[in-house]
């Protein structure tokens, strides 16, 4: 690697020629000259290694910044595309369901109107002592039975519609939460999730969520500042401890989380 090559080249530096010219006119013992030369050469090599590591650290830092920038752009594009596709998919499901159940919904409304009308006629017959022929009783009973069936079917369909609306609200809530906390740490995400747990999804949910996220960020700001101060090297020797840390790719994970939410809700349809 580049770092090892630069360090190896630094170790090959030979300062003996320069020292010979320096001590050429100086009367000094060979032992003292050799000792001084050893110390001088070691110092030169040490500074050369430090200089090489400093340049490598700057190059690595610039590369990491570029990678992080590209990762954020890719993550933003992926989440935007997934959200658009999921929104279209849910709209399509809702339209299909309304089309398939339009007849049943209409029948339910008509059944309620018929029940009201039939009840009014019954009261009218009783008030005016109108006697219904016996052969008509079966017809009325059948109509009442059919009416009851329509009422039950209508109630079932409306219950199913309410459940689907609840699922849609759930996935929109989860997407909003995932989008707002994508730049937070895991501990901060847990705090936000705990704080919004009792808040129902509504038009005001986004503003409440934003306020909670900002509050969590602010509460962790001082802690982050202290941590950065502790981790910042104060000496030149500490700056040489070049450590490469693995960066977790959160773009794919964030996209997979959103897809799993939509897939879970879509499976209920």
UniProtKB/Swiss-Prot annotation:
UniProtKB keywords: Viral capsid assembly, Viral release from host cell, Virion
Entry similarity comment: Belongs to the T4likevirus capsid assembly scaffolding protein family.
Native source species: Escherichia phage AR1 (Bacteriophage AR1)
Protein name: Capsid assembly scaffolding protein
Gene Ontology CC terms: virion component
Position of the signal peptide: none
Gene that encodes it: 22
């Amino acid at each position: 690697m580049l770092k090892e090559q630069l360090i190896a080249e630094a170790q090959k530096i030979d300062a003996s020629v320069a020292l010979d010219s320096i001590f050429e006119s100086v009367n000094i013992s060979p032992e003292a000259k050799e000792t001084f030369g050893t110390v001088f050469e070691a110092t030169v090599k040490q500074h050369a290694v430090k200089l090489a590591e400093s340049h490598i650290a700057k190059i690595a830092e610039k590369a990491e910044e570029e990678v992080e920038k590209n990762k954020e752009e890719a993550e933003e594009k992926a989440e935007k595309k997934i959200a658009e596709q999921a929104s279209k998919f849910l709209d399509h499901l809702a339209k299909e369901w309304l089309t398939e159940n339009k007849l049943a919904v209409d029948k339910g409304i008509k059944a309620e109107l018929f029940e009201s009308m039939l009840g009014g006629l019954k009261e009218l017959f009783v008030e005016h002592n109108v006697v219904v022929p016996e052969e008509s009783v079966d017809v009325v009973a059948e109509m009442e039975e059919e009416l009851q069936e329509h009422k039950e079917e209508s109630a079932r369909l409306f219950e199913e519609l309410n459940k689907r609306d609840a699922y849609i609200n759930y996935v929109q809530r989860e997407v909003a939460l995932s989008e707002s906390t994508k730049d937070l740490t895991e501990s901060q995400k847990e705090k936000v999730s705990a704080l919004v747990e009792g808040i129902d999804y509504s038009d005001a949910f986004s503003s409440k969520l934003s306020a909670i996220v900002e509050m969590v960020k602010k509460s962790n700001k001082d802690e982050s500042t202290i941590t950065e101060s502790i981790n910042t090297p104060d000496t030149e020797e500490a700056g040489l401890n070049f450590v490469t840390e693995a960066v977790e790719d959160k773009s794919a994970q964030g996209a997979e989380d959103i897809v799993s939410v939509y897939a879970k809700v879509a499976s209920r349809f």
